[in-house]
C-alpha cells in the first residue's frame, strides 16, 4: 500500500516527501508490492521506492528512512519536519498505533490503511473514521489501543467491510 500511495502522491506533483521502510524486497512480495521485481530482490524497499520516485520526479525533495519506526523514533521523525499529511501503511500494530497517536496529537491529518488479508471484494472497501470500522481485525486492535491512549475517533482509515475468507 505504501509504495502505491507514495507513487501516486509523487505523480500528483508533491514537492517534499519522506518514506520509511526497513524491509528488503523478497520473492514473496512480487505478487503484491510495487517495488518487488526479480531485479530488486534483496534490495532495501525504501531505496527501490526512492529511485522510482526520483525517476518520476527528479525535483522531488525526498527523505528516505531505511528503518522501522519505533516509539521514540516516531516522535523524533514527526518533530523534525513539518508534515502536512501522513499516509500510514504500516502493517505492525504497535508502530502503527504510535504513528497514528502522535500524528493525531500534533494535528497532522492522516489516513491509515487497515487489513486486507483474505479479502477479495474491492466493492466493500470503505473510508471511514476508525470508530466506524467493522469486520477488520487490524482496525479493531488499532481502535482498542487508541482508546487506551484517549483517542476514540478522528482518524480516517481505509478498510473492507468484507468478512475475511478463512480459505484464502
Language model regions located:
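Adenine nucleotide-associated cytosolic modules
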Residues: 1-168
Amino acid at each position: 500500500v505504501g509504495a502505491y500511495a507514495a507513487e501516486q502522491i509523487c505523480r500528483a506533483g508533491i514537492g517534499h516527501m519522506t518514506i520509511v521502510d526497513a524491509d528488503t524486497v523478497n520473492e514473496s512480495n512480487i505478487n503484491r508490492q510495487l517495488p518487488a521485481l526479480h531485479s530488486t530482490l534483496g534490495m532495501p524497499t525504501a531505496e527501490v521506492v526512492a529511485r522510482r520516485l526520483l525517476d518520476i520526479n527528479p525535483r522531488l525533495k525526498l527523505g528516505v528512512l531505511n528503518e522501522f519506526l519505533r516509539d521514540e523514533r516516531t516522535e523524533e521523525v514527526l518533530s523534525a519536519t513539518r508534515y502536512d499529511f501522513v499516509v500510514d501503511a504500516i502493517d505492525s500494530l504497535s508502530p502503527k498505533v504510535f504513528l497514528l497517536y502522535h500524528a493525531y496529537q500534533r494535528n497532522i491529518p492522516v489516513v491509515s490503511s487497515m487489513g486486507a488479508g483474505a479479502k477479495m471484494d474491492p466493492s466493500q472497501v470503505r473510508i471511514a473514521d476508525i470508530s466506524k470500522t467493522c469486520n477488520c481485525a487490524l482496525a479493531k486492535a488499532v481502535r482498542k489501543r487508541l482508546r487506551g491512549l484517549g483517542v476514540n475517533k478522528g482518524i480516517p482509515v481505509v478498510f473492507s467491510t468484507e468478512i475475511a475468507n478463512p480459505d484464502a
